[in-house]
Amino acid sequence: MADDMVYQEAVAAEVIQVSGRTGVTGEIFQVRCKILGGKDTGRILTRNVKGPVKVGDLIMLRETEREAKQLGKRRK
């Protein structure tokens, strides 16, 4: 089965803002990132990232078509 998998190139993106945390335990960060390569160079996306991340980090995105929904306000 591994032979049938097709390799997709990843695109580098730089984290420019950490917007907040999401997920049941807050393990997912919502970030705004600037695409550094590919057909969407210069585009700014909102993405959800798993794991620790800070402004200035480089992340590799498998695709640049989808964008995460904005976080809603927390209800009390």
Swiss-Prot record:
Superkingdom of origin organism: Archaea
GO biological process: maturation of SSU-rRNA; ribosomal small subunit assembly; translation
UniProt keyword annotations, A-Z: Ribonucleoprotein, Ribosomal protein
Molecular function GO labels: structural constituent of ribosome
UniProt keyword Ribonucleoprotein present: yes
InterPro entries the record matches: NA-bd_OB-fold, Ribosomal_eS28, Ribosomal_eS28_CS
Cellular-component GO terms for this entry: cytosolic small ribosomal subunit
Pfam families: Ribosomal_S28e
Protein family membership: Belongs to the eukaryotic ribosomal protein eS28 family.
PANTHER family per record: 40S RIBOSOMAL PROTEIN S28 (PTHR10769), SMALL RIBOSOMAL SUBUNIT PROTEIN ES28 (PTHR10769:SF3)
Listed HAMAP family: Ribosomal_eS28
Name of the protein described by the UniProt record: Small ribosomal subunit protein eS28
Gene name linked to the record: rps28e
